[in-house]
Amino acid sequence: MLKSLPPTMSVHSKLYEGKAKILYTTDNPEVLLADFKDDATAFNAQKRGSILDKGRINCSISSQLFKKLEANGIRTHFIDSPAPNQMRVKAVKILPLEVVIRNIAAGSLSQQTGLPVGTVLKQPLVEFYYKNDQLGDPLLTSDRLLLLELATAEQVDVIKNLALQINEFLRRFWQQCGITLVDFKLEFGLDSQQQILLADEISPDTCRLWDTAETDPNRRVMDKDRFRRDLGNVEDAYQEVLQRVLQTVDTQN
């Protein structure tokens, strides 16, 4: 377990650059530094832009939520946040899966099934997508997932159970923030002991968040849909989410 780390751990080379973060190696092979970017993308990077302070905001929100999840028994890759837009994380091998948990119909679920946007689901829906930009991150059946050997059947069961636990916690937390958790995406990885850890981030980039007190279908949006759908005020929405998270954490402490 990585408990205590030197505050001035040196950063080495760039390991990987994704759409939202850059990962750097450090002088500890089991620790990476994640640098959160202000870049914004949508529709598998077909739409690109920038959201002022997004890196700082998403890193701050993710850090708070990872700490809360750890305190509730969910193992994550989070270690600490040495700077507002940086997070030290445990090195994991990311499973090529995007795990989407849905509480309310929206986005592709509504488009593909005809369920009206806003339909509350009788129980949370857990979906697995193939994390592959070239293929457009397709929805997987359980048989296809196993056929492609993206994870073992046992790992899939563990991940699904973790996803439902995380959803239950986050749904309650966002509710305390006056925010409805419509759906969200998670990624998981394997550490050096082959243990499954929650990885990536939890932020308005990866969650569909609606202002609970707002009924207007456009004004209620507090997530990356504001960027996707050109609704404007993206920075204000992200900042508002951060403020509510910090206020809720402060109240709970």
Show the residue positions of the predicted features:
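Surface-exposed helix-capping loop/turn segments at secondary-structure junctions
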Residues: 71-77, 169-181, 251-253
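A long amphipathic alpha-helix within ATP-dependent nucleotide-binding catalytic cores
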Residues: 150-182
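Phosphate-binding core of ATP-grasp and ATP-grasp-like enzymes
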Residues: 119-136, 167-180, 203-208
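A short glycine-rich, hydrophobically flanked beta-strand micro-motif that places a catalytic Asp/Glu
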Residues: 80-85, 174-190
